[in-house]
Amino acid sequence: VESKLAQDIKRIDKILKDELPKYDWPISTSPDFIKDNGWFSAGRSYIKAILCIYAHHQPKSFIDDSIVNINNYWLKQANSKNYHHFFPKAYLTKLNMDEQKINHILNITIVDDFLNKREIKDKSPSKYMDKFKKANLHLSETMKTHLIMNLDDFGVWADNYELFFEKRAEVISQEIEKRIIKQDVDEKPQVIIIDDLPEEEFETE
């Protein structure tokens, strides 16, 4: 049986020749698939793909609209200084939210270390974002770089995590859709890839 590495090499060779490689499994871009399979671990290939989309948008600092300095070394670890739960873990835990829904790629944003550790901590989004709104006159545009397209519509000012979760899933779904060349196999339902396991397990802040 041909190894996965050998298969990948053949596919890359096809891409280099401007040919479309074939895959044996379907790719789902639906919001429901993201919600069901987005538990956060920086070692999972599925999560890495979505993190690449986040980074592609050059996320900016909530507080001053400057581009976040993304450290490639830290991005390999789920406890990275760059990873922030937009609805903080401590805040959602107090509301008895399910852990798998708290520690989810849809709740992850890429920020700088100072912002994550000292400015946000366990505050609700409406509280810490109100502070940033006064400091950052471009906050609405800043948040679009995090694929949070509208603070009201995403339930941020109402601290509505369920609404935020749904809305961000829709946006991430659209972003994945833009990058996928649909093939016949994609007509089949996708199941989570069995070997999409984390390389290492860490806790996020």
Residue map of PLM features:
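Charged substrate- and nucleic-acid-binding regions of tRNA-handling and nucleotidyl-transfer enzymes
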Residues: 1-7, 123-158
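Intrinsically disordered, low-complexity N-proximal targeting/linker segments that flank membranes
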Residues: 1-83, 91
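Non-catalytic, well-ordered alpha-helical scaffold segments
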Residues: 48, 106-109, 170
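A broadly conserved detector of short glycine/acidic/proline-rich loop/turn motifs that flank catalytic sites
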Residues: 57, 87, 92-93, 114-116
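Histidine-centered nuclease catalytic patch
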Residues: 73-107, 124
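Short conserved micro-motifs at the rims of enzyme active sites and ligand-binding pockets
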Residues: 92-95, 119-126, 154, 184
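Short Cys/His-centered divalent metal-binding micro-motifs
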Residues: 102-104, 108-134
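C-terminal, well-folded lobe of enzymatic/effector domains
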Residues: 140-205
